[in-house]
């Protein structure tokens, strides 16, 4: 069996006295494309932050390549795992090319400058994400979908084995949602990159992810393929609405039943 890339065992976490995650255990493997799904407040973003070493669990353990996350050098971890938050506030005016190049920072020593190789890797990341055409534009001048592609390019410039994304298609129109997810699917397929992302659209999750983890009230309800997870009775219980299931091009389709 393939070695787990990241392994979480019995993870619990609370914000002050509010429990958010309760006894979470899961593992990721090479080329997993995992969609974390579930209602608002189910713990998706918090789980991603624990996987990205942004938050420390109150109990349980996280291992990356069989080494405890608490003992791994942060710089080395940043070379292997990249994190893309939902929001990208930029106070200072940076050009797109500068933001992508920031992805090389985990490889730089203090007071050193980017090498020719760093610039080449950043350029390839922009080509892969179709952001080269606005490399010289300022980040705050481009659209939401373009900003998301730039952040993926910066994360890709880290040359990671795993990418963690918090709702990468939030607030984007359908065209940009498909564009972003297609780029991620390409990274997963061609670069063999492991992807874990929080998302709300169950139909897009079914179309692009090879594995879904359904969370509710801080616990894993179901973990498996889209066909194993997107079950009528389970979805109705978790989301509290009636749904119908169908299929299109081999993917499960979830349709809310709207009373008229």
Located regions from the model:
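The feature captures the beta-strand-to-loop junction immediately N-terminal to the Walker
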Residues: 37-39
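Conserved ABC transporter NBD signature motif
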Residues: 60-68, 77
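Conserved ABC ATPase signature
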Residues: 112, 138-142, 146
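Catalytic Walker B motif of ABC-type/P-loop ATPase nucleotide-binding domains
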Residues: 163-167
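Helix-to-loop junction immediately C-terminal to a conserved catalytic motif
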Residues: 52
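Conserved ABC ATPase "signature" region
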Residues: 101, 116-134
């Amino acid at each position: 069996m393939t070695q787990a890339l990241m392994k979480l065992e019995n993870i619990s976490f609370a914000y002050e006295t509010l429990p958010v995650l309760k006894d979470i255990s899961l593992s990721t493997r090479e080329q997993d494309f995992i969609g974390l799904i579930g209602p608002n407040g189910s713990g998706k973003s918090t789980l991603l932050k624990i996987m990205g070493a942004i938050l420390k669990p109150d109990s349980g353990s996280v291992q990356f390549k069989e080494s405890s996350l608490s003992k791994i050098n942060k710089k080395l971890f940043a070379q292997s795992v990249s994190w893309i938050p939902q929001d990208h506030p930029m106070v200072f005016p940076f050009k797109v090319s500068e933001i992508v190049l920031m992805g090389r920072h985990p490889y730089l020593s203090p007071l050193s400058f980017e090498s020719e190789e760093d610039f080449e890797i950043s350029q390839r990341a922009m080509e892969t994400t179709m952001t080269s055409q606005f490399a010289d534009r300022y980040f705050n001048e481009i659209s939401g979908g373009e900003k998301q592609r730039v952040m993926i390019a910066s994360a890709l410039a880290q040359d990671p084995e795993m990418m963690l994304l918090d709702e990468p298609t939030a607030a984007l129109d359908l065209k940009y949602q498909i564009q972003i997810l297609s780029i991620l699917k390409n990274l997963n397929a061609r670069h063999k990159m492991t992807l874990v992302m929080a998302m709300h659209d169950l139909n897009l999750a079914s179309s692009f992810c090879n594995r879904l983890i359904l969370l509710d009230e801080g616990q894993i309800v179901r973990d498996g393929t889209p066909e194993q997870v997107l079950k009528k009775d389970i979805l109705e219980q978790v989301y509290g609405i009636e749904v119908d299931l169908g299929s299109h091009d081999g993917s499960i389709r979830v349709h809310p039943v709207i009373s008229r």
